[in-house]
Amino acid sequence: MRLSPFIILTALLLWPSDAGSAEQLVAAKIIVFKSERRMELLDVKSKILKAYEVSLGGNPEGPKSQQGDSRTPEGIYKISSRNPGSSYHLSLRISYPNRQDIAEAEALGVAPGGDIFIHGLTNGRGFLGFQHLLYDWTDGCIAVTNQEI
């Protein structure tokens, strides 16, 4: 089986889930291995700082090609912003779609979609914890527990 990693390049500080937590990691890269449902935070020397199990979009096989396909994108992206008004705990927007994604969608005559994030659980549902890993439930985002984000 071909591994299709989803790679995010970032230099942002990944903040703890509560202000009182002392643990903070500075990651140079985040790699998501879709087929393994695994996300790794790497330092500038590509050493793994931390690894997480993740849930993906409800239709995770293959690259995202259009809006509404419930797929998680594959490619190189950046963390473009934090979304303080999100319905999900501490969401980080990624820079999907990039130029290549837009060109591929235009060639197919479809909208590429957007609003892809790395986030915790739905607000008010943090109690679910690792139970969210039982199935892929996002619309294309990458989900971890609230404690992990």
Show the residue positions of the predicted features.
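Sec-dependent N-terminal signal peptides
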Residues: 3-13
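Exported/periplasmic cell-wall-interacting domains
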Residues: 23-25, 81-149
